[in-house]
């Protein structure tokens, strides 16, 4: 039996964000996810989760920035992660620390690490090396809290220039990252656009325990 989580960034948008938890619970959901929690106090979210008997299953690391204001502005400005961007290592580490503090407060055991959009000035090799270093660091920091770091291939039609697009690349990166708590978030929507036949990668990668 599949389990479904309500994505509160896209559902119940007629309600203020903190009221969406109750709406999801009333519709029978037992779990929720959303893009980012950073504009809200973690304890306010934790109260909504507990009051409505909901489990927080996933949210994203900051797309860039280190506090609520800069994170929100980065998203509006089109930033989609900095994990693959050279010279942004300190900012990445600060964003990771913030995400882990929120995850710990919300008892959330999975965080999505957005890769980022590669600029024309950045070589593929440099982006890949930076990404592996940041993912390894994220995995090490998250492991102490029992949290998984997820990497997700995203299609190039919706997000041109995004560093990570295909399942094969994601699983090759896992080999280089070599952290057991870094796994692939396999979104079938993105997979279908990029690779067409979703059955083949499901059969290939689900048995690995890395999805």
What positions do the PLM features span?
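Histidine/acidic-residue-rich catalytic or RNA/ligand-binding cores of hydrolases
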Residues: 194-202
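Generic enzyme active-site microenvironment
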Residues: 31, 150-153, 185-188, 192
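Glycine-rich, phosphate-binding/catalytic loops in enzymes
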Residues: 22, 48-49, 128, 166-168, ...
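N-terminal pre-domain/capping segments
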Residues: 1-104, 175, 179, 183, ...
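Hydrophobic residues within beta-strands of alpha/beta enzymes
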Residues: 32-33, 111, 149, 211
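Catalytic-core regions built around general acid/base machinery
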Residues: 45-53, 134-142, 201
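Active-site-proximal loop/turn and secondary-structure-junction residues that shape catalytic pockets
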Residues: 10-12, 38, 62-65, 115-119, ...
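Active-site acidic/histidine proton-transfer and metal-coordination neighborhood
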Residues: 78-183
């Amino acid at each position: 039996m599949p389990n479904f989580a309500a994505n509160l960034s896209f559902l119940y948008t007629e309600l203020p964000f903190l009221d969406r938890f109750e709406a999801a619970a009333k519709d029978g959901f037992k779990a929720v996810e959303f893009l980012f929690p950073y504009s809200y106090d973690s304890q306010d979210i934790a109260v909504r989760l507990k009051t409505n008997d909901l489990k927080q299953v996933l949210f994203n690391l900051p797309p860039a920035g280190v506090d609520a204001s800069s994170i929100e502005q980065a998203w509006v400005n089109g930033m989609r992660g900095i994990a693959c961007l050279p010279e942004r290592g300190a900012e990445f580490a600060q964003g990771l620390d913030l995400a882990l503090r929120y995850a710990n407060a919300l008892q959330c055991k999975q965080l999505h690490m957005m890769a980022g959009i590669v600029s024309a000035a950045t070589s593929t090799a440099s982006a890949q090396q930076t990404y592996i270093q940041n993912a390894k660091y994220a995995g090490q920091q998250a492991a102490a809290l029992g949290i998984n770091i997820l990497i997700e291939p995203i299609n190039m039609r919706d997000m041109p220039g995004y560093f990570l697009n295909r399942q094969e690349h994601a699983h090759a990166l896992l080999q280089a990252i070599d952290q057991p708590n870094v796994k692939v978030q396999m979104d079938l929507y993105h997979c279908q656009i990029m690779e067409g036949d979703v059955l083949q990668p499901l059969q290939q990668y689900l048995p690995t325990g890395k999805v």
